[in-house]
Amino acid sequence: VLITNTAVLFCDAAAWLFKGRMDLLGFYAVRIANFCVFSFGYILLAVFTDYLVCFIASRGFGILKFPARVMWGLSFTAIVLVIISQFNHMYYLIDDNNIYHRQNLFWLSQTFGIFCMLIDGSLLFRYRRRLSRAELMAVGAYIAMPIIAMFLQIYIYGIAVLYLATTISALCIYISIQVEQSHKFACEALALTGSRRPSGLRKTMTRPNS
């Protein structure tokens, strides 16, 4: 998830870096970067659903792979529409000055993400009683924040609100995982220390008096 999110941020930065440049490198860089921003964004949705399914399964609960397959299908469909938009410019247009402009159907590109996040939200709601509070908050933030950002992105132009939200949410999940692992290691160390104490105590009690 973090790797895919990093790829999205890198492509978004490249799109801003090369916009307006009239040389050959700028011409191709802006077009490739904007295409990758859309495509990697959809791939990120599918990768996260895969992660969520595996995350729930790792807790010992049976969960079908069907939601992940549906998400990959939706992501593939969305990418196909991005390819089509390169010819009919329904999502965006890059003008003669090598500047990106939204088009009338840009909102459609965002609805795919909103719908995919709702699927993830339904999974989280269904298995909410089987996850800890910290896990629910971390995963829930990754679902809720991008949904809010997608709505805002439709109306806010010039600021990558969506990618900032996904980055912050991914960091929340990463921090949650690190905290959980630290707590697990601390509990294991405490249990190991407790298992050694009775043995040492028995040796002390059975030692003959001098």
Spell out what each predicted region is:
Residues 18-35, 59-66, 97-104, 130, ...:
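Juxtamembrane loop-transmembrane helix junctions in multi-pass integral membrane proteins
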Residues 1, 24, 53-67, 124-135:
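Membrane-interface helix-boundary motifs at transmembrane edges
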Residues 1-53, 70-88, 139-154:
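Hydrophobic alpha-helical transmembrane segments of multi-pass membrane proteins
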Residues 123-189:
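Interfacial "cap-and-anchor" motif at the non-cytosolic start of specific transmembrane alpha-helices
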Residues 31-42, 101-114, 163-170:
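Alpha-helical transmembrane segments of polytopic membrane proteins
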Residues 47-51, 110-131:
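Alpha-helical transmembrane segments in multipass membrane proteins, preferentially the mid-helix core
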Residues 77-122, 153-155, 159:
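Extracellular-loop-to-transmembrane junctions of the mid-late helices
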Residues 191-210:
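PAS/LOV and related PAS-like sensory modules
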